[in-house]
Swiss-Prot record:
This is Apolipophorin-3. One of its GO terms (biological process) is lipid transport. Keywords: Lipid transport, Secreted, Transport. Belongs to the insect apolipophorin-3 family.
Length: 23
């Protein structure tokens, strides 16, 4: 589904943000 693409991108962004705060 195309709707899963932006959802996945958002999840990746959130993960990166979490890693940045943890660093």
């Amino acid at each position: 589904d195309a709707a899963q693409v932006p959802d996945f991108a958002t999840a990746v962004q959130n993960l990166x943000h979490t890693l940045s705060e943890a660093a």
